[in-house]
Structure formats: structure tokens, C-alpha cells
Design a protein with these regions (language model features):
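Extended soluble regions of mature proteins
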Residues: 9-258
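C-terminal segment of classical bacterial N-terminal signal peptides
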Residues: 1-8
Length: 258
């Protein structure tokens, strides 16, 4: 009898990420991809397992030995559970003087990520424009695109054709699925005003017609985050790569019953 295989081939993306407003914030990480599934390890403390077909994300804390599931059902449950309480808080704030009300709204937004001013608008469609500048990361040459909102720079992507990147088709699928998750699942939560999940520099690979070995995010005209591919290689993926660790317990989001 042939031995059962405990691993199969997948794609490994090594990347570096730097937050410009935090000194010495450069961090390396790994994304493992197998068709519609992916796993990103963030240092040794956390992992994120994503299923593009199911549009489901499992956020794992190795320190606490817990995980949280974020999908369409949980996003809708969060909005439904928190909205009545938020509406009551908004009503109470209306009785405050304007300056005090503004101060409270700002404090809740900054400290708790709660939008008391009402439901957030869906992230606007951005204007994408190819520039004449070029770049390189991990030995991959690319050309810069800019994404602006009413002339305000939001993102920059250094783009290369998928065929120029090893396993480019797998990466195209990954980026497309992740962009859909951001738009539909994260968008559901943000539009409710219940919680505000920070925007992520995820390119729409269909619009830029390629892959971004370098992604940059801007806020108020200043660079706040840059992510670069260091390498893209084939790797053996153990059968348990996309499984939740044994012994970890689920930490449910507000309003979510499983």
C-alpha cells in the first residue's frame, strides 16, 4: 500500500509590512494559499484563515487560544445586535451642547471604533490611474497605479501582469476573493455604524489588470502602510494548514449565536 499523503503543493508568499507612523514597525509575514483557501500568520501571536468560496474568515489568537469567525451571518448579527443600543446613545447625545456632543462622538470613534454619527457610507469607488513610474519588489518589476477619491490619494499599487509572478493565477483568485470579502462582509459592519473596521489596501485585481507586489495606503496625504512581496514560491502544505488548532475555543462576536 502507498502511504497516505499528509501534504500537497501550495503557494507561499513572504511579505514585509511597514507602518510609517510607528517607529521600527517593519514586520515580515507569510501567506499560504491553496486555491480558494489561505492562511496568514502574523508573527507568532495570531493567524487568519480565509475561505474565499465561503467568504468566511477565522481570526486566531494563539496567546488566548481563541478564534473568532467573521462571515455574512456574523456581520449581519453584529449590526442587528448593536444598532438599538447605538440609536439610544445617539438620542442621548442630541441633548448635549454641540461642542460636548462632538467631543463624545470623536472619543467613541477613536477609542472604541464606534460611529455614533450614523451609518457609514460604503467605501467610495476610487479613480484608478496608471502612472509612468516603475518599481520592483522581490525581483518582480512593476508599474505604479494611483487610486484617488476626489483627487485625494488613497492607495498606490505597483502592478505587474499575473504571468510575471510565480503562481500568478492563484494570487489573482486570492486577491479577488479578499476584495469581495472586504466589500460585502466588512462593508456590512461598517455601513451599520456598529463598529468600524479599518480599511485595508486590497487592490481590485480586475481593475488594475494584474497583481500588486507593492501596496501603499495613505491617510490625509501621508503614507501610513506599505506592504511588499519578498518572494513567491511553491511549498508543501500539511493537511492541517487550514484547520483551527485543537483545543482553541470560539470567542463569539456581539449578537452571534452558533
Amino acid at each position: 500500500l502507498l502511504p497516505l499523503s499528509t501534504a500537497h503543493a501550495g503557494v507561499s508568499v513572504q511579505y514585509d509590512s511597514t507602518r510609517s507612523f510607528i517607529p521600527n514597525s517593519a514586520k515580515g509575514g507569510t501567506i499560504l494559499i491553496d486555491k480558494h483557501r489561505s492562511r496568514m500568520d502574523v508573527g507568532t501571536n495570531a493567524s487568519v484563515i480565509f475561505d474565499g468560496n465561503a467568504q468566511s474568515m477565522e481570526i486566531i489568537s494563539h496567546d488566548d487560544k481563541t478564534y473568532t469567525v467573521l462571515d455574512k451571518a456574523s456581520a449581519e448579527a453584529i449590526s442587528a445586535e448593536l444598532e438599538p443600543a447605538l440609536q439610544q446613545m445617539r438620542t442621548q447625545l442630541q441633548a448635549l451642547p454641540p461642542e460636548q456632543r462632538e467631543m463624545m462622538e470623536k472619543m467613541m470613534a477613536e477609542r472604541m471604533g464606534i460611529n455614533l454619527q450614523g451609518a457609514a457610507e460604503q467605501e467610495p469607488d476610487l479613480d484608478l490611474k496608471k502612472t509612468d513610474k516603475s518599481g520592483e519588489s522581490g525581483g518582480i518589476a512593476c508599474n505604479w497605479w494611483q487610486a484617488t477619491d476626489d483627487t485625494v490619494l488613497r492607495y498606490e499599487y505597483c502592478v505587474t501582469p499575473a504571468k510575471s509572478v510565480p503562481y500568478g493565477d492563484d494570487l489573482l483568485k486570492y486577491f479577488h476573493d479578499l476584495k469581495q470579502f472586504k466589500r460585502e462582509i466588512v462593508g456590512t459592519i461598517n455601513r451599520s455604524g456598529a463598529l468600524q473596521i479599518p480599511s485595508l489596501p486590497i487592490a481590485d485585481v480586475r481593475e488594475i489588470e494584474g497583481l500588486p507586489p507593492i501596496s501603499r495606503q495613505y491617510q490625509d496625504g501621508k503614507l501610513i502602510l506599505e506592504t511588499r512581496f519578498v518572494s513567491v514560491t511553491e511549498t508543501d502544505l500539511p493537511a492541517a494548514t487550514f484547520n483551527l488548532p485543537e483545543g482553541y475555543s470560539e470567542q463569539k462576536l456581539p449578537g452571534v449565536a452558533r
